[in-house]
A protein has these predicted regions:
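A short beta-loop-alpha structural element at the N-terminal edge
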Residues: 1-11
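Helix-loop element at the rim of GNAT/NAT acetyltransferase active sites that forms part
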Residues: 10-24
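Conserved beta-hairpin
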Residues: 41-54, 59
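Conserved acetyl-CoA binding element of GNAT-fold acetyltransferases
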Residues: 59-79, 104
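Conserved acetyl-CoA-binding loop-helix of GNAT-fold acetyltransferases
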Residues: 71-92, 110-118
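Conserved beta-strand-loop-alpha-helix junction that forms the acyl-donor binding cleft
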Residues: 94-113, 130
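Conserved catalytic-core motifs of GNAT/GCN5-like acyltransferases
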Residues: 122-130
């Protein structure tokens, strides 16, 4: 990724309301190092009317990471459509990876959960820290 893309991702990270993988946002250097050292299969910045509104990425477990400044059903649908039209899930590996795309959602992100349910997406798992 370019430095501009890393900066835009950092802006989104600072704007994020819900976190899954960390308790507090990383520093700009920590973020830059992470983005450079941990490439996802694909990572897209999402714009609407030339304004940055979020990012989406795919991982090797077929998970889709969606981070939008505000979650709206039409934008979620557009993300799903783009991903499905441009990418195929990796083949399943028993006990490792499904052969379908899925999304991990913070339990606090009730708006996205509601949108997914309205779109007839079904919940397959809940995770708990121990």
């Amino acid at each position: 990724p370019t430095q501009n893309q890393i900066d835009e991702l950092f802006f989104l990270l600072q704007s994020r309301k819900y976190f899954i993988s960390h308790k507090t946002p990383p520093s700009k250097k920590e973020h830059s190092d992470f983005v450079s050292e941990h490439p996802y299969l694909v990572w897209y910045l999402i714009y609407k009317n030339k304004n940055l509104i979020g990012s989406v990425y795919l991982q090797t477990d077929n998970s889709i990471g969606i981070d939008l400044i505000e979650y709206h059903e039409n934008e979620i649908l557009s993300v799903f459509k783009y991903i499905k039209n441009n990418h195929k899930p990796l083949p399943s590996i028993k006990s490792v990876r499904r052969d379908e795309f899925f999304i991990n959602v913070s339990s606090e992100n009730t708006n996205l959960i509601k949108i997914l349910k309205n779109l007839d997406k079904y919940e397959i798992q809940r995770s708990f820290l121990v």
